[in-house]
Amino acid sequence: MVPMWFLRVANDICIPTSRNTHKYHNLRKRPSASVMIDISRAGLNLKGVLIRGRVELIYEEEARRINRSIHLKYVMPEALDDVKVSSYLSEGDDVTVKVHMDRLISWNLTDSNAGKALSVGGWFYPLNDELASD
């Protein structure tokens, strides 16, 4: 999985999802996952983590509570008071995928031979606010 929104809680990664997704149905059949999180900020600072672990699917009130915390990480509290936003998020995100981290692998392209070659050669496009908004 490559989550758009997530929250780390202790040694777990929590990801909101819907019961209507292929992801949800696949995780019910096989409750394990790999999660890729890109923590790059800009330019050549290309870093991330790969998390592997067993999955627990959370429902009902606990899922609503966790998913609300995840949503508040990314949107202002006032957004959740807006009927359109809150109905979309609450209807769409009715399950929480909790990945219990069994293995964590970090990566850093900046320090790799490929990253150094690209950097020295000037082959990266600069990442800036203008490009990020396109």
Where are these regions (language model features)?
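Short secondary-structure boundary/capping segments
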Residues: W5, H25, R41, S87-L89
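Short, surface-exposed beta-strand-loop junctions and turns on beta-sheet-rich folds
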Residues: L7, T21-K23, A42, N113-A114
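Short beta-strand segments
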Residues: M1-R19, L27, S34-D38, L50
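Amphipathic alpha-helical interface surfaces
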Residues: N20-N26, E62, I66
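Short glycine-/acidic-enriched loop or helix-start segments at secondary-structure transitions
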Residues: M1, Y24-H25, N108-L109
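Short acidic (Asp/Glu) patches
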Residues: R19-T21, A33-I37, M76-V85
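A solvent-exposed, acidic/Ser-Thr-rich amphipathic alpha-helical stretch
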Residues: N11, G43-L46
